[in-house]
Design a protein with these regions (language model features):
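HhH-family (HhH-GPD) DNA N-glycosylase catalytic core used in base-excision repair
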Residues: 1-294
Length: 294
């Protein structure tokens, strides 16, 4: 057993992060003291266990059965939990706002979480198009269990090569429409064959990534913006076509009604360069409020 520790940029309330993740995926994260996820590190499937061991300053412990690769284990753990995201500049901007200032105080230390790979994030961006997150989660679970690897009771997301070898008909049995199955298989081809180098993305500008993604069949403006804000941690990006975001921004920052995409961006403009983070906090506040009320 390998035991490591990391120090995220504070504030970082890991239990609050798990509570938020649970509100989006009911049934998961019942134990709010530890996060378990199956990942692949240098082609070795393993399970990471991450728990907070100190709040101020924040410190987290990582456990895994993988004996080596300490630097890669730490890097991947930091990536998944947004350990290097500094919330303080956003909090300073939000503090003067009567609604978001209150929400950021209540959710102090909340950060998003993301999948272990950008390829998985691309598949998420495809599966979540125009359906509920719950339905998309069920579809992805079937994809993972059909094409992934099982390790210590959890499933590792399938590799691009594995999904490239799948058939559209088989992918459709997981719940995907024919078109989405073609999109997933197409993206897997692009990545597995080296035509789409995801390793370049972190060094690229927002606009360069967006334009590149829009050239890929099945990835439109919503998917590109969602990939940027969640997958690449670009905190000013907003998938403003998203009905949920348009509704929650209208409810808390507007007159209570769903806004247009342009109206959504206008209302969030006060929080530049953290518009995406502002939208995330509004969504998290609403989801957690509903979860606890229910």
């Amino acid at each position: 057993m390998t035991v490591l520790s990391i120090s995220p940029v504070g504030p970082h309330d890991f239990e609050l992060c798990l509570r938020n993740a649970r509100s989006f995926s009911p049934g998961l994260f019942q134990d709010l003291t530890v996060f378990r996820t199956a990942v692949r590190i240098q082609d070795n499937p393993t399970v990471l266990e991450i728990r907070q061991i100190r709040r101020k300053p924040p410190a987290l412990e990582i456990r895994t059965a993988l004996p080596n690769n300490a630097s890669e284990i730490k890097r991947l753990a930091r990536w998944i939990i947004f350990a290097d995201l500094d919330l303080r500049p956003f909090y300073r901007i939000a503090a003067s706002h009567p609604i978001l200032g209150t929400i950021t105080k209540e959710l102090h230390g909340l950060k998003p979480m993301r999948p272990a790979s950008l390829f998985e994030m691309l598949v998420i961006a495809i599966t979540e198009q125009q359906i509920s997150m719950a339905a998309a989660y069920r579809i992805r679970t079937r994809i993972i269990e059909r094409y992934g690897e099982r390790v210590n009771g959890l499933w590792v997301f399938p590799t691009p090569r594995r999904l490239r070898e799948s058939s559209v008909a088989d992918l459709m049995t997981c719940g995907l429409s024919r078109r989405k199955a073609e999109y997933v298989k197409g993206v897997a081809h692009e990545v597995a064959d080296g035509r789409l180098d995801l390793g370049r993305f972190e060094a690229m500008s927002d606009e360069a990534v967006r334009l590149l993604l829009l050239q890929i069949r099945g990835l439109g403006p919503w998917s590109a913006e969602y990939f940027l804000v969640r997958g690449l941690s670009r905190p000013d990006r907003v998938p403003a076509d998203d009905l949920g975001i348009r509704s929650v921004v209208g409810r808390y920052l507007g007159r209570g009604q769903r806004l247009s995409p342009q109206g959504t961006l206008r209302k969030l403009s006060a929080f530049k360069p953290y518009r995406g983070l502002a939208a995330f906090y509004l969504l998290a506040y609403e989801r957690m409020s509903k979860y606890h009320a229910g």
